[in-house]
């Protein structure tokens, strides 16, 4: 969403129904990779949240409530897909 881009990150989709078991995160061209992986995980019976991260810097400026609404704190399993730079993903 346009608002999500302005906030640095947004939920692209929740797949599989119910509480997500894993959060897949990516930016740029890698977003298509997490979409494919998410669909495959749903086929295997998993619930997945897909998050697009256009800007770590903008996301870090958001209030904690927004950050928690995107990166659910109760979901500890998280995978970041990035072909170039690891900056930001360690957070």
Q: Which residue stretches match the model-derived regions?
A:
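Thiamine diphosphate
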Residues: 1-91
């Amino acid at each position: 969403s346009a608002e999500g881009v302005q906030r640095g990150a947004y939920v692209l989709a929740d797949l599989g129904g119910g509480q997500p078991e894993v959060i897949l995160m990516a930016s740029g061209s890698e977003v298509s990779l997490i979409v494919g992986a998410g669909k495959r995980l749903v086929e295997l019976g998993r619930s997945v949240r897909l998050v697009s991260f256009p800007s770590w810097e903008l996301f870090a400026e958001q209030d904690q409530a927004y950050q928690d609404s995107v990166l659910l704190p109760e979901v500890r399993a998280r995978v970041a897909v990035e072909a170039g730079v690891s900056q930001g993903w360690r957070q």
